Every structure is written in C-alpha cells, then in structure tokens.
Design a protein with these regions (language model features):
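C-terminal cap of thioredoxin/glutaredoxin-like
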Residues: 1-21, 26-30, 64, 145-224
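Short extracytoplasmic/periplasmic juxtamembrane "stem" segments immediately C-terminal to an N-terminal membrane anchor
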Residues: 26-47
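Flexible, active-site-adjacent loop/turn segments at secondary-structure boundaries
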Residues: 42-44, 50, 73, 100, ...
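A short beta-strand-turn-helix
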Residues: 42-59, 87
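Alpha-helical scaffolding within the catalytic cores
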Residues: 47, 79-81, 175
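Short, well-ordered turn and helix-capping elements at secondary-structure junctions
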Residues: 48-49, 99, 165, 174
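Short clusters of hydrophobic/aromatic residues that line enzyme substrate/ligand-binding pockets
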Residues: 51-52, 138, 204
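Structural alpha/beta surface segment adjacent to cysteine/selenocysteine redox centers
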Residues: 57, 62-149, 153, 180, ...
Length: 224
C-alpha cells in the first residue's frame, strides 16, 4: 500500500484502532505485509458516493483509493473482477468508492475529479476502469484523452471538473480519511450494510490477494 503523509490532529485520536506491523512506516510496503484488520468505531458517510451493486446487499465494502497508486491498480486487476462476479453481481456485496488522492501523485486528484464527473454521464465505473487500465499513461496523456477514448463528452466533463462542487466532493473524502486516520491506499472498510447512509466495519489496508480478501468477506457474511 501507499501511505498519506499527513499528521492526524486530536479529533482523530479515538476513531480508528490500528494494530502496527513492521510495514507501518514503509511508503511502498508489499501487499502481503499490510496491517491486520482493525475496527472503525465511528461511521463513514455514504450519501452521494459512487456505488456498485444492490442497495439491499447484506455487506458493504468501502474503498479509499488513488488512481495513481500501483497497489490500487493491483486490486482493480487481480481482485475486483472476482469480487464483482462472485459477490457484487450476486447481490451479496455493495462496493462503494471514496477518493484518497495522495499529494505526491500529481494526476490522482484530476483523475478523481474526472471520474466523479463521468457519473453525470452515467459512466463513472467505465472511466474508473479506464483510468486504472491506463494508469501508466496518466502523466503523459492526461485524463481527458483517456475519457475521450471511451467516448465520454469531454467538453461536459471538463466543465464539471472545474466546478467547486466537484472539488468539494474530493476534499470531503480527504477530510473524512484524515478524521478516521485512513492514510494508506488502498484501504477497505468491510461491514454490514445499513439503511441510514452510514457505514462502519473492519479496516483492511493493502491489495490483499483474492483468496485472503475473499476469506474476509466470507467471515463477515457468516456473522450476518
């Protein structure tokens, strides 16, 4: 996973119970050395966030991710297809994305804005996938060229990206991550679905291999 280099103020001191491992200070730690799951003791807000899957699914997974993060791409390539096929498409899991663009990734925030704006054209997940698929091209080509390749209305997209409301959505995600001491990408919060637009659960850092990620899902579903 990749870590966000931000200090957490006193408002976040009792919100997240983290167990520390030897990888805690490594900015580029291997995916198999992430911290063990911890409990998020207060709630995330889900209203208006991009969601995949049924709102009636018994389990919700919230992802904090960065479009330039290599471990986030690994999750997209090696885990999400199986997750979608076995759990999202079958109505067992609802998958929700939140943005955590890290400050040293210059294209991450524009990519997050573009994806948010693709939702206006009902194409959020299409651009989400394209951005990860072409991650190595982000810096040299930019998000607009990638959006053009999947036939998005790029004029409309650019207008939306420049709006204050779009930046506010991303900054709200960043503030929420800081509040909950979520500093690494990708980070997942896995817990039972609720009807009040809020979420809490176990916090998992890193792009786990699919068998390990699947085991965590099955464990949560068996608790239900």
């Amino acid at each position: 996973w990749l870590a966000l280099g931000l200090g957490i103020g006193s408002g976040g001191t009792l919100l997240l119970q983290h167990w520390t491992s030897t990888s805690a200070t490594a900015p580029n730690a291997p995916a198999d050395r992430q911290r063990p799951p911890a409990a998020l003791t207060t709630e995330l807000l889900l209203a208006g966030e991009p969601a995949m899957g049924s709102s009636d699914a018994p389990l919700t997974i919230v992802e904090f991710s960065d479009f330039e993060c290599s471990y986030c791409r690994r999750f997209h390539e090696q885990v999400l297809p199986s997750l979608q096929r076995e759990y999202i498409d079958t109505g067992l899991v609802r998958f929700i994305h939140k943005d955590l663009p890290l400050p040293f990734h210059r294209q991450a925030k524009p990519a997050a804005a573009a994806a948010r704006c693709a939702a206006e054209q009902n194409r959020y997940w299409d651009l989400y996938s394209a951005l990860f698929d072409q991650q190595t091209c982000l810096a040299c080509r930019g998000v607009i060229e990638i959006a053009k390749e999947i036939n998005l209305d790029t004029s409309r997209l650019q207008t939306c990206m420049q709006q204050d409301t779009t930046q506010t959505l991303i900054n709200t995600n960043l503030s929420e991550a800081e509040l909950h001491n979520i500093r690494a990408t990708p980070t997942f919060i896995i817990g039972p679905s609720r009807s009040d637009g809020k979420h809490h659960g176990n916090v998992v850092e890193g792009a786990l291999p699919w068998p390990q990620f699947k085991a965590l899902i099955d464990q949560q579903l068996n608790v239900e």
